[in-house]
Amino acid sequence: MKDKIIDNAITLFSEKGYDGTTLDDISKSVNIKKASLYYHYDNKEEIYRKSVENCFNYFIDFLLRNHDDNYSIDGLYQFLFKFIFDVDERYIKLYVQLSSAPEALNSEIKHHLQEINTTLHDELIKYYDPTHIALNKEDFINLILLFLETWYFRASFSQKFGVIEDSKNRFKDQVYSLLNVFLKK
């Protein structure tokens, strides 16, 4: 039941944010009484903490599962495409919602963000090949991270409004433009 509560809470927090999600919403989503939630969790903040932890664990697992050994420009394109469009949209939306998380959770969220950024940095650096890329390593990483953050915001809205296929086509064009910016001619 604890896993089901968290799974449903992730959906609710991703759609309504922390303040918009109530314990009543969570209890109704798993068909239990609100009082029964307290058997599993002390309060909404604990449920949110666990949801955020699961979100970041999902991202790290996704990164580690979805890389391949093709650390080429084509491999980078495939990696970026997967990291934008194959991630469960609930986690993207929850990630976007973190900016409005309770202030008491800032240090925990910052820790999780640092962990995911380290994992992502370590994965992206494998695609860096100075014989093909005109930027230095840090500029290359920063440009890719900026691109991913922008697309996460877009993807969260695209999925909400049902234009994901249009977004995929735009992504393809924009990632090629991005790659052309830093490839050596």
Swiss-Prot record:
The keyword Transcription regulation applies. Residues 22-41 bind DNA. Keywords: DNA-binding, Repressor, Transcription, Transcription regulation. One of its GO terms (molecular function) is DNA binding. PANTHER family: ACREF/ENVCD OPERON REPRESSOR-RELATED (PTHR43479), ACREF_ENVCD OPERON REPRESSOR-RELATED (PTHR43479:SF11). Homodimer. This is Biofilm operon icaADBC HTH-type negative transcriptional regulator IcaR. It comes from Staphylococcus epidermidis.
